[in-house]
Structure formats: structure tokens, C-alpha cells
């Protein structure tokens, strides 16, 4: 909570070439917190996404809420990401919710990069926070300093990686330092969840953001696309409703390609139904643009896909999703009087 996720997201979008300037939460002009409630309260309520580049490589980020009240948005976003940047404040340190998010990421086999934020504040303790990440989360942290470069991670860091990987150690002893081999093996260790890079910085003034961009480019670049003839398959990670009542289904494409007007298999009670994609778009904050097609790894939004729910798999091997791991402590029930017709109640809801 209040670790600086949205501020860091704005800096990534700014330094990644998407924004002309980074917005501020306290000014209410951020790209990703565009909802009226978010801007008035100064907190992230809805998970929203945008594109940026790191060292010439394309990325898409999803800025998620930090408050436990909106953990559902965060958990659903985990289904869509190839890696996660876990932001920890150097002032508050590792919190209980940090541990919850960490467990969810581990359960879903999502690689993690730590950004230790607010290191510029007088009460910050970067070293203590790094030690707490190692002790409380059990993460094998690889500290990446301000001189880290995606093109050449450096021999000192390569030696740290070699100490964790027999293949890289053998190659290092035989041939010496090889920048490409060190970067590739480092990326493999990060993808496997065996190593978690960590960057210390201060998102508000941009400190450490360029280092983070280089870390993402070196260790977290998108996987290679599958063969073009693979059957289309995607996971639903979010559903939004337009003002006209239409449903927009947000998808992470897992294989194959999706184009507008194509029929897609969707899970329904008792079997599978086919729905036509009436529109395909890519979102960036509150704005969107039409897509001609969406390939493997793409985050897109489709209209017309029936009543699918977050977690469902559509396309080949269409099936309902697993229930969320996080359960709310409180629940609410709407009790209508006998004078209210069921259809009218449904319209009101």
C-alpha cells in the first residue's frame, strides 16, 4: 500500500517513450489512474494497462491496486503477466500484503523483479529493506546497481549468476566472461523464479527507473512467439462494462492469432458456445485503438464474447477458470421485496 506503484508506472511510460511527461498521483493527472474515483481518492482502484519500450524492446505493463480491498484486481492481473515488478517501500519495508502478493506470484510461477522505492527519503533504509526481502520472503535477490546495462551486465554480476548456475559456471571457467551467455542464463534463472533482480530507487524523481528498464530488457523480454499455425487460445483476465451496457473482455493471447469477426469457442454451463468477435482493441490507460490482429503474448480487449468470466480460457481447449485464491472477509447480499419483479432487479444491478 502506497509503495509507489502508479508513480513508478508513470515513470516507466515516460522514460519508455509513451508519455511526454510523467503524471503525479497527488496532481490527479496520471495516465493509468483515470477513473473519477481514483483521481479524487488518490489511490488505484482498477487495474489498467499501457505499452512502453525498454532498450528498444516492446513491453506492456498493468498497474494494479495496492490496497487489500481491491486485491481481486491484482490477482486477476497476475493471470496476464509474464513477469511482475514488486514495489517495496524503503520506508515501510515488507508489509503483510507484500507477502500475500509474493505468495500469489509464486503460486502462479510468475518471475519477480523487486523495485525498492522511496530510497531518497530521510527515513529510508534500503539495506534493511533488501535484507527483509531476503529474510521474510525467502527470495534469492540479485542486486542490480545503477551501472547495470542490458547489453552487457558486467563480469561482477555474471560471477554472482555463475555461483547460482552450474552451466554458466562451467562456461565461465572454460571461456571466461561472455556477455551474451551471462545475460541469457540470467534470463533463464529469472524466468524459472530462481533469482529475483532488485533495483533501489526513487520513482518520484526517476532514480533507478533507467536501471529497471535495463533489467527488464535483459531478463524479462517477451518469450518467442509460437508457430503461426497454432490454434488460438487466450485467458480472460478482466471484464469491463461500457456505458451502453456492452461487455469488454480483456484477453492474454497464449497461442495462435485472433482477428475481428472470427468465431471463438467460449466455455458455458454444460459445454462450449461460439461467439463472434465484434471488435478488437488495445488499451492504454483510458484510451484505446483498434487492432487488426492479436498474436501470442498480446494483451487485447474483445467485444462480443458472451458471458465469459475472468480466469476462463477461450479458443482451443476452452474451459472455465479456477476460483480466485483470495477470498473477501466480508460479503453482501441484495434482498428485494416481493413487489419488485426479478427482471427489474436484474436491470438495477
Feature annotation, model-predicted:
Residues 1-349:
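Structural and coupling elements of P-loop NTPases
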Amino acid at each position: 500500500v502506497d509503495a509507489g506503484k502508479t508513480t513508478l508506472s508513470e515513470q516507466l511510460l515516460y522514460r519508455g517513450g509513451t508519455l511526454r511527461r510523467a503524471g503525479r498521483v497527488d496532481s490527479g493527472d496520471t495516465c493509468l489512474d483515470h477513473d473519477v474515483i481514483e483521481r479524487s481518492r488518490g489511490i488505484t482502484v482498477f487495474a489498467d494497462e499501457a505499452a512502453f519500450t525498454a532498450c528498444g524492446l516492446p513491453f506492456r505493463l498493468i498497474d494494479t491496486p495496492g490496497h487489500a480491498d481491491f486485491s481481486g484486481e491484482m490477482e486477476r492481473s497476475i493471470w496476464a503477466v509474464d513477469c511482475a515488478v514488486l514495489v517495496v517501500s524503503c520506508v515501510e519495508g515488507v508489509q503483510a500484503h507484500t507477502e500475500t502478493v509474493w505468495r500469489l506470484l509464486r503460486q502462479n510461477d510468475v518471475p519477480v523483479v523487486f523495485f525498492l522505492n522511496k530510497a531518497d527519503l530521510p527515513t529510508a533504509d534500503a539495506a534493511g529493506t533488501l535484507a527483509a526481502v531476503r529474510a521474510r520472503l525467502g527470495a534469492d535477490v540479485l542486486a542490480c546497481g545503477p551501472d547495470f546495462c542490458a547489453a552487457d551486465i558486467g563480469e561482477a554480476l555474471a560471477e554472482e549468476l555463475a555461483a547460482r548456475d552450474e552451466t554458466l559456471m562451467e562456461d565461465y571457467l572454460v571461456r571466461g566472461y561472455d556477455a551474451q551467455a551471462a545475460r541469457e542464463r540470467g534470463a533463464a534463472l529469472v524466468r524459472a523464479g530462481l533469482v529475483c533482480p532488485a533495483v533501489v530507487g526513487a520513482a518520484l524523481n526517476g532514480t533507478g527507473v533507467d536501471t529497471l528498464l535495463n533489467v527488464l530488457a535483459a531478463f524479462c523480454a517477451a518469450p518467442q512467439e509460437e508457430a503461426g499455425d497454432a490454434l488460438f487460445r487466450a485467458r480472460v483476465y478482466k471484464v469491463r462494462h461500457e456505458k451502453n451496457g456492452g461487455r469488454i473482455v480483456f484477453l492474454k493471447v497464449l497461442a495462435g492469432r485472433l482477428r475481428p469477426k472470427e468465431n471463438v469457442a467460449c466455455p458455458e454451463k454444460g459445454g462450449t458456445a461460439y461467439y463472434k468477435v465484434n471488435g478488437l482493441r488495445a488499451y492504454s490507460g483510458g484510451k484505446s485503438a483498434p487492432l487488426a490482429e492479436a498474436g501470442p503474448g498480446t494483451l487485447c480487449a474483445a467485444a462480443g464474447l458472451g458471458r465469459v468470466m475472468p480466469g476462463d480460457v477461450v479458443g482451443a481447449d476452452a474451459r472455465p477458470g479456477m476460483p480466485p485464491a483470495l477470498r473477501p472477509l466480508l460479503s453482501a447480499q441484495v434482498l428485494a421485496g416481493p413487489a419488485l419483479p426479478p427482471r427489474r432487479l436484474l436491470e438495477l444491478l
